[in-house]
Amino acid sequence: MALWMRLLPLLAFLILWEPSPAHAFVNQHLCGSHLVEALYLVCGERGFFYTPKFRRGVDDPQMPQLELGGSPGAGDLRALALEVARQKRGIVEQCCTGICSLYQLENYCN
């Protein structure tokens, strides 16, 4: 009985100290099935959307053509292509390559 009385305050402390799920989820790398599970956790019944990237063809009008020669303006096109690539970061680049938070994952919910 004396052991139980000593452990009771410790048990009460552990129960009260348990972090909430929002605090338990820190910014982290999420890849593959871990990323999908995190999206299910964050989005719940709303669900989430995913549009897989397809391989861009040479004539894709959304991707600026790069001039590899030394013609004038080639540097401008390279800078534009790099800027477009930076703006089109997907969830994998954001959460797997980098780290993301619950708030960033919520951007992918329906």
UniProtKB/Swiss-Prot annotation:
GO cellular component terms, A-Z: extracellular space
Location in or out of the cell: Secreted
GO function terms (MF aspect): hormone activity; insulin receptor binding
Keywords: Carbohydrate metabolism, Cleavage on pair of basic residues, Disulfide bond, Glucose metabolism, Hormone, Secreted, Signal
Top-level lineage group: Eukaryota
Predominant location category: secreted
Signal peptide: 1-24
Disulphide-bridged cysteine pairs: 31-96, 43-109, 95-100
Keyword DNA repair in annotation: no
GO biological process, one term: positive regulation of protein secretion
Propeptide residues per the UniProt entry: 57-87
Any one Pfam family match given in the protein's UniProt record, by short name: Insulin
SUPFAM superfamilies reported for this sequence: Insulin-like
Keyword Secreted: yes
Cross-referenced InterPro entries: Insulin, Insulin-like, Insulin-like_sf, Insulin_CS, Insulin_family
Role summary: Insulin decreases blood glucose concentration. It increases cell permeability to monosaccharides, amino acids and fatty acids. It accelerates glycolysis, the pentose phosphate cycle, and glycogen synthesis in liver.
Family, as annotated: Belongs to the insulin family.
Complex formation: Heterodimer of a B chain and an A chain linked by two disulfide bonds.
PANTHER family registered for this protein in UniProt: INSULIN (PTHR11454:SF9), INSULIN/INSULIN GROWTH FACTOR (PTHR11454)
Protein name: Insulin
Gene it is expressed from: INS
